[in-house]
A protein has these predicted regions:
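Gly/Pro-enriched, hydrophobic low-complexity segments
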Residues: 101, 124-205
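One face of beta-strands
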Residues: 38-46, 59-63, 69-73
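An acidic-aromatic
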Residues: 62-114, 184
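Short hydrophobic/aromatic-rich beta-strand segments that constitute the beta-sheet cores
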Residues: 44, 71-75, 90-93, 144-146, ...
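Anionic-ligand binding region
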Residues: 115-124
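N-terminal leader/targeting segments and the immediate start of mature chains
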Residues: 12-55, 200-205
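Hydrophobic h-region of N-terminal signal peptides that target proteins for export
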Residues: 3-13
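Short, surface-exposed charged micro-motifs
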Residues: 60-62, 72, 80-82, 132-134, ...
Length: 205
């Protein structure tokens, strides 16, 4: 798998990327959009590329987010798998198996929660102690490239790419690259911002 070490050649459907000359302007725009965003929901298609397999693993599902720190990530095809994050607690349901984890007492899951929430809200690039950030754009997207600086993150992530729609700054694509060469790409569609989502969707049993 080719890691995107040369961003000027990296392309999306809207054309090649160019580096943003004033990233502070983008950060300000994004901060304002985030402040106004109370909920997000979208469909997603996840594509897992494993170096040991010739075929890609494709899964589909539904994603929901609600301030503060509430997230529901539900795979519906070809299997059912549910993850709920709610104020320091993580609930996982794998078919009939159920697990509940107090993230605050588990360093590994705390990091997972940090990355998931940071990717969804797009604010990982503000953490200069943990990530080196680069900013790019084309006609339809802003793209933030993140390289982990913390040793514990480098163990399982080499790069993260977060793509934002220029119209509403919602996340449209997320790419997570691993040191092994494996890669997970997630494309979001049908995104609704500030639609009503009942709290029951985020209950941890």
């Amino acid at each position: 798998m080719i890691l995107f070490m040369f961003p000027v050649f990296f392309t999306f459907s809207q054309g090649p990327l160019t580096e943003i000359k004033k990233p502070e302007v983008f950060k300000q725009m994004f901060s304002e959009a985030t402040r106004k965003t109370q909920t997000i929901e979208a469909d997603f298609i996840q594509e897992k590329n494993l170096s040991i397999l010739s075929e890609k693993i494709i899964t589909k599902g539904r994603f929901m987010f609600k301030k503060e720190k509430k997230l529901r990530w539900e795979y519906t095809d070809p299997f059912h798998y549910l993850i709920i994050l709610n104020n320091g607690m993580m609930f996982i349901q794998d078919e009939e198996k159920k697990h509940k984890i107090d993230i605050r007492n588990n360093k590994m899951f705390a990091e997972i929660n940090y990355i998931i929430m940071g990717c969804v809200q797009g604010n990982l690039f503000n953490d200069e102690k943990k990530f080196l950030s680069s900013f790019f754009e084309n006609s339809g997207s802003f793209v933030v490239k993140l390289k982990p600086l913390a040793s514990n993150l480098k163990e399982y992530l080499s790069e993260i790419w977060i793509c934002f729609d220029k119209n509403d700054l919602s996340v449209t694509r997320l790419e997570m690259h691993e040191p092994s060469g494996d890669c997970t790409n997630i494309d979001f569609s049908g995104t609704k911002i500030n639609a009503t989502i009942p709290d029951e969707k985020f209950l941890v049993p």
